[in-house]
From Swiss-Prot:
It comes from Pyrobaculum aerophilum (strain ATCC 51768 / DSM 7523 / JCM 9630 / CIP 104966 / NBRC 100827 / IM2). This is Large ribosomal subunit protein eL40. GO terms for cellular component: ribonucleoprotein complex; ribosome. It holds the Pfam family Ribosomal_L40e. Coiled coil: none annotated. GO terms for biological process: translation. The lineage of its organism: Archaea, Thermoproteota, Thermoprotei, Thermoproteales, Thermoproteaceae. GO terms for molecular function: structural constituent of ribosome. InterPro entries: Ribosomal_eL40_arc, Ribosomal_eL40_dom, Ribosomal_eL40_sf, Ribosomal_zn-bd. The gene is rpl40e.
């Protein structure tokens, strides 16, 4: 089901799809406020990227 341009629905989708961090060493998903990776304990985290087509 495609998302229309309703700003409230779009904000909810963006929060759930892009508001977390990815570990650069093991690739695990982590919460947005994480300092260390939950799986490998590395501090090398990056925010999830948003790419427009």
């Amino acid at each position: 089901m495609p998302i229309t341009l309703d700003p409230e629905k779009l904000a909810i989708v963006m929060k759930h799809r892009f508001q977390y961090k990815i570990c650069r060493e093991c690739g695990a998903k982590n919460p947005p406020d994480a300092v260390k990776c939950r799986r490998c304990r590395s501090r090398n985290l990056r925010p999830k990227r948003f790419r427009k087509k």
